[in-house]
Amino acid sequence: CGMYDDEMNIIATGSCFGNTLRCMAVSSAHQGEGLMNQIVTHLISVQFERGNTHLFLYTKCNSAKFFGDLGFYEIARIDGQIVFMENRKTGFSAYLERLKKESEQSEVMKRFTSDNTQILSETSSETQKDLRIAALVMNANPFTLGHQYLVEKTAAESDILHLFIVSEDQSLVPFSVRKQLVLEGTAHLDNIIYHESGPYIISNATFPSYFQKDADAVMESHANLDLTIFVRIAQALGINCRYVGEEPNSQVTGIYNEIMAKKLPENEISCTIVPRKEANGAVISASTVRTALKNDNIELLKTLVPETTLRYFQSEKAAPVIAKIKAAENVVHH
């Protein structure tokens, strides 16, 4: 949206993207006139009309107080760079409570506590120190043999694995399908607690770039903010190690992994970067799978995905997803 003066010069603007407010600015000649307040109020109204009632925004540190006065609450900040905020006072704390409840009520935890006669909670930190409680975050767009290998390795090396599936629908394969394929492809493992990432584990798709001077600075801010939030999640669940797949061909992921390898140990969380599984002389990637689907290369697909994923894509239910992949101009980075 935009606001204009009498000569139709734009003097204030703001935008909606998904469940976020962004790109908000007021002309320097019109500061102090309450225009930003009007812009934010209008954007919130638009979002509510769209059915988006849980809203988020990113802002510079020196603007956080202003948005706080408009009903937004700080989730996390990187000093001197960026603040992540939401319009629910207890939004993030309620999310952490939900994760803890999911963990406590899971069959994994029930079986584990029954076998060990000790309850895993924040109050039993000494118990947790003796356990390897791992975390994996994956988009699985879609679930491949590479994902399966990473999950199997992490589960084998851990007492309990918290597996977070990115729930934002910014991918060619919708979340409901991605989740289904992850669950089916890991059903043979008995120490996994599954979580939907919710809106707090931040994806590249929703992280804004307009605050930063270049792509590396964007990635550094994204990584630091995402990891700050992850540390709080880890503390709530007793997670003491995180696994991640190596991305030798991705500068973006390389920066993220580099920051993660430094930041997590500072918070008593180890970081294990796992070399990627290969097939046909190359690393297995979801983008290669999407390319195979786009080109109807079923023989290649069979070498890249587990039976559960293959069965889905050969079923009638997959037709709309495959059609979407075929219609996309770029299936490599999506």
How would you name each of these model-derived features?
Residues 59, 70-72, 77-334:
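Nucleotidyltransferase catalytic core that binds NTPs
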Residues 47-60:
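Conserved GNAT acetyl-CoA-binding A-motif
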Residues 2, 8-25:
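Conserved beta-strand in the GNAT
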Residues 1-4, 76:
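N-terminal charged segments
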Residues 30, 34-43, 146:
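Conserved acetyl-CoA pyrophosphate-binding loop and the N-cap/start of the following alpha-helix
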Residues 40, 61-63:
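Short glycine/proline-centered loop/turn elements that form peptide/ligand docking sites
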